């Protein structure tokens, strides 16, 4: 008898607690640290903070969803991701029709600049750059597919995309939490201004080394390289989960041994032994590029700091 009386009370209490949690603000989950950093900046001063699904040391290319992370997603009012070409481990979950209203896919936003993925090995001469307004540049047709749609999914490494993403985040949050709509939109504008200053500082820092040639671990940086006019010559892999074949390795070994490379960049999340084997055969500078900001503290300054950290790493390894 007591159990029959208590059960409705327990259910009512659970519903009340859940409602109170929602009354405290929207439950937001950002899939990767760069998205989390932008969202934290947009939510500053609202009394709410986003949750981070993947820590910076985990590559989204190689991630596997744990039960605790699945629970985070299940409880979220808003899930912010780059898109299915990056967070492939979420495809089966987030692409379900019932989740459409809860998911903000940043790579699909109007105004986002997408860069064509380049093949592993030596890059071809040319990169497509386009947005929803049809902006394109000349390119070669000899590239291999980078991801599902052939476009580089690392859209956050172009600061122009960072501005677009911040505005979209603010607009979506304003719908979920109208009481703080002005705060969200003001924060997005403030982040855009900080990115203006960051972009100017990076442009000045990298100007002396724009002509210096280098190799990267995987083709993740087309947005950053295109924005700042850099001179990459190739990538060891088109994507970390797809290591190059023997022909590509030989091609890259030849490039490195030619003496025309100022630096070879690896990544803290991914540092394959076969890259080290190639480097051991040659006297070439080695640097580290961190597209996810593994060493940076999370928070409102994370995203501008991530871009600046990339610039510093490039400058320090490429300078004569």
Regions found by a protein language model. Name each.
Residues 1-2:
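N-terminal secretory signal peptides that target proteins for export/translocation
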Residues 5-17:
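Bacterial N-terminal signal peptides
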Residues 20-320:
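Extracytoplasmic metal-acquisition and chelation regions
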């Amino acid at each position: 008898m007591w159990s029959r009386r208590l059960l409705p009370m327990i259910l009512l209490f659970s519903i009340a607690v859940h409602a109170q949690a929602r009354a405290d603000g929207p439950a937001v989950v950002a899939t990767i640290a760069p998205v989390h950093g932008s969202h934290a900046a947009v939510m500053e001063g609202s009394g709410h903070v986003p949750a981070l699904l993947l820590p910076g040391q985990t590559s989204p290319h190689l991630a596997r969803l744990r039960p605790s992370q699945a629970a985070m997603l299940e409880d979220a009012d808003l899930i912010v991701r780059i898109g299915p070409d990056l967070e492939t481990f979420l495809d089966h979950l987030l692409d379900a029709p019932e989740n459409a209203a809860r998911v903000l896919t940043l790579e699909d936003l109007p105004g986002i600049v997408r860069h064509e993925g380049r093949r592993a090995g030596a890059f071809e001469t040319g990169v497509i750059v386009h947005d929803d307004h049809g902006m394109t540049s000349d390119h070669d047709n000899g590239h291999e597919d980078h991801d599902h749609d052939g476009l580089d999914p690392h859209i956050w490494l172009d600061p122009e995309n960072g501005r677009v993403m911040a505005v979209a985040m603010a607009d979506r949050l304003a719908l979920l939490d109208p009481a703080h709509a002005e705060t969200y939109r003001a924060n997005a504008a403030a982040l855009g201004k900080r990115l203006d200053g960051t972009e100017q500082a990076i442009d000045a820092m990298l100007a002396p080394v724009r002509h210096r040639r280098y190799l990267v671990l995987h083709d993740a940086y087309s947005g950053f390289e295109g924005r700042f006019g850099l001179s990459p010559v190739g990538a060891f892999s088109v994507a970390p989960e797809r290591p190059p074949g023997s022909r590509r390795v030989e091609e890259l070994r030849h490039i490195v041994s030619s003496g025309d490379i100022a630096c070879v960049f690896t990544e803290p999340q991914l540092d394959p032994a076969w890259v080290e084997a190639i480097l051991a055969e040659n006297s070439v500078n080695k640097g580290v590029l961190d597209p996810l900001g593994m060493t940076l503290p999370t928070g409102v300054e994370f995203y501008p700091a991530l871009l600046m950290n990339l610039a510093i790493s490039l400058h320090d390894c490429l300078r004569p």
